[in-house]
Amino acid sequence: MLLRFTKMHGLGNDFMVLDLVSQHAHILPKHAKQWGDRHTGIGFDQLLLVEAPNNPDVDFRYRIFNSDGSEVEQCGNGARCFARFVLDKRLTAKKQIRVETKSGIIELDIRSDGQISVDMGPPRFVPEEIPFEAAEQATCYTVDVDGQHVDMAAVSMGNPHAVLRVDDINNAPVHELGPKIEHHPRFPARVNVGFLHVVDRQRAQLRVWERGAGETQACGTGACAAAVAAISQGWMDSPLLIDLPGGRLSIEWAGPGHSVMMTGPAVRVYEGQVRL
């Protein structure tokens, strides 16, 4: 059978989006791996599935697969593309949408200027909830990475993140430390790794090594996690701007117990069909 799909991106973090509300198909991890290959498939960082909700209090169910076939809990840039997609496809007429993910419910707000704000929910710091192996909760942890002591914050934005502060974003050891920390035994579910350079109290630069995808042009949950880490450690103030290789996100966080708000663009690239 042929399935209609849409290619989209949020700041260069690119997605294949499938409407499984009006189309019916059983998508498996092997399909994500096959389609995600940039040489022999469609090519993307993540596959996003738009499904009918299980919960009557929400509008849609949102599932995410990395290009390696692994299913993940959350994707912030994908959430903005999800909102743009369901509106453009007339799956809803609402400008404010509630969506269930593997990690909980998020709220999407399509603004009049075309930007999309996502209520990502409150960050989680309890090690067991990230998950991260630590004797007790802390703002900063020192982790032994191949004999090198690396300081990092650990936080969950519905998916696990480690955040490292660096002095030079261009020479940050993303490809050296990224995969080592991603697979570090203290992160039993693997982890996304953010390399953060603080420019001033309102602006920072960020590169992210994403779990199951490698370095991407942008990572929405990574930007949220980096902002939370920077505010928690007293480096920055809310609201703030995070510059990623693919562009800029605006992040707001009022502190523990409060939701993180992320605002940025979502772009449709093309429509296509793929054989299942």
From Swiss-Prot:
Gene Ontology cellular component terms for the protein in this record: cytosol
Residues the record marks as site: Could be important to modulate the pK values of the two catalytic cysteine residues: H161, E210
Binding site for substrate: N13, Q46, N66, G76, N77, N159, N192, E210, R211, G220, T221
Reaction catalysed by this enzyme: (2S,6S)-2,6-diaminopimelate = meso-2,6-diaminopimelate
Active site (catalytic residues): C75, C219
GO function term, MF aspect, one: diaminopimelate epimerase activity
Residues in coiled coil: none
Enzyme type, top EC level: isomerase
Alphabetized InterPro entries for the sequence: DAP_epimerase_AS, DAP_epimerase_DapF
Keyword set, alphabetical order: Amino-acid biosynthesis, Cytoplasm, Isomerase, Lysine biosynthesis
Entries under SUPFAM superfamilies matching the protein: Diaminopimelate epimerase-like
Broad class of the protein's primary localization: cytoplasm
Family named by the database record: Belongs to the diaminopimelate epimerase family.
Subunit structure: Homodimer.
Function: Catalyzes the stereoinversion of LL-2,6-diaminopimelate (L,L-DAP) to meso-diaminopimelate (meso-DAP), a precursor of L-lysine and an essential component of the bacterial peptidoglycan.
Record-given protein name: Diaminopimelate epimerase
Annotated organism of origin: Pseudomonas syringae pv. syringae (strain B728a)
